Curated annotation (Swiss-Prot):
Belongs to the adenoviridae E3_20 family. The keyword Glycoprotein applies. This is Early E3 20.5 kDa glycoprotein. It comes from Human adenovirus B serotype 7. Pfam families: Adeno_E3_CR1, Adeno_E3_CR2.
Amino acid sequence: MISTTIFIISSLAAVTYGRSHLTVPVGSTCTLQGPQQGYVTWWRIYDNGGFARPCDQPGTKFSCNGRDLTIINITSNEQGFYYGTNYKDSLDYNIIVVPATTSAPRKTTFSSSSAKASTIPKTASAMLKLQKIALSNSTAAPKTIPKSTIGIITAVVVGLIIIFLCIMYYACCYRKHEQKGDALLNFDI
């Protein structure tokens, strides 16, 4: 789970400078183009850091064709960040929804292919930072083992030893008295 999150966040860090900002009026339809090759997986990134796959959501609000994501009849709920990746290349969009009466400002688009050379060192440093964050957020092993844990482990070990000794005792006693039949296996009716 952590590796998937690190992959998604590091991919987002790699395309931060290649983000396309789109201003879309309410009620329109917008198509986000994904990378050219391969099957594209689309993610929606929420302000609280959560992720969702719009193509997997029920309803007819989002339409996916394997490469492009089409958002139909946009409302203010669809405003936010959308990220498409084929796990080799990726594109990132910031959709800003404006009222239908407001004229849309000029669209500024940055190509992710032109930003690749400059983002490689930044991506590497971002990935290292993400790995450090993931390791620091994980629960560190305590230096001392709690007494309750020691008690539980001791009880389990003692129980297993008692069961083992009972089995050994039964096996040894049964061999000494071979003429005796096993009462549990004797089915004389």
